[in-house]
């Protein structure tokens, strides 16, 4: 039997994510790129998102982002449109909440874009649930 002369497993190779606190430079869209908001995660590196011009498309998460950057619903992403397939596109970059707010402040994202909320797209009134008190407060459980 050979001796274990290694220095650890895959967790050691993976290292620590110390660069999360560092701010990166804000990336704006170029030709052939658009901003979108994630509607639904489909699995297998795919997701459904709505471009801010109103078109819903199927998106593919590229290999560089696949297991390193976690994308959730209502995230703002930068996508590269495909010239040969109109209904599909590729995810290039995921913006965090601060970067998305900056994009909105610069006028890159429309005003109706909701950044940190689960309800996506469109100016909608906030539906609040109202509960009515049906029973008497004096009524005791033992009296029923």
From Swiss-Prot:
Question: Which PROSITE patterns does its entry note?
Answer: IF1A, S1_IF1_TYPE
Annotated region (Disordered) at: 1-26, 114-144
Quaternary form? Component of the 43S pre-initiation complex (43S PIC), which is composed of the 40S ribosomal subunit, EIF1, eIF1A (EIF1AX), eIF3 complex, EIF5 and eIF2-GTP-initiator tRNA complex (eIF2 ternary complex). Interacts with EIF5; this interaction contributes to the maintenance of EIF1 within the open 43S PIC. Interacts through its C-terminal domain (CTD) with the CTD of EIF5B; from the location of the start codon by the 43S complex until the formation of the 80S complex.
Is the keyword tRNA-binding in the record?
yes
Q: Which SMART domains match?
A: eIF1a
Into which family does the record put it? Belongs to the eIF-1A family.
GO MF assignments: translation initiation factor activity; tRNA binding
Annotated CDD domains: S1_IF1A (cd05793)
| Record localization | Cytoplasm
Q: Where is the composition biased (Acidic residues)?
A: 124-144
Name this protein carries in UniProt: Eukaryotic translation initiation factor 1A
Role noted for this protein: Component of the 43S pre-initiation complex (43S PIC), which binds to the mRNA cap-proximal region, scans mRNA 5'-untranslated region, and locates the initiation codon. This protein enhances formation of the cap-proximal complex. Together with EIF1, facilitates scanning, start codon recognition, promotion of the assembly of 48S complex at the initiation codon (43S PIC becomes 48S PIC after the start codon is reached), and dissociation of aberrant complexes.
**Any single Gene Ontology cellular-component annotation:** cytoplasm
Give me the stretches of Basic and acidic residues compositional bias.
16-26
Pfam families, per this entry?
eIF-1a
Q: Which UniProt keywords apply?
A: Cytoplasm, Initiation factor, Protein biosynthesis, RNA-binding, tRNA-binding
Basic residues bias spans = 1-15
Mostly located where?
A: cytoplasm
Q: Which InterPro entries match?
A: NA-bd_OB-fold, RNA-binding_domain_S1_IF1, TIF_eIF-1A, TIF_eIF-1A_CS
User: Which stretches make up the S1-like domain?
Assistant: 22-96
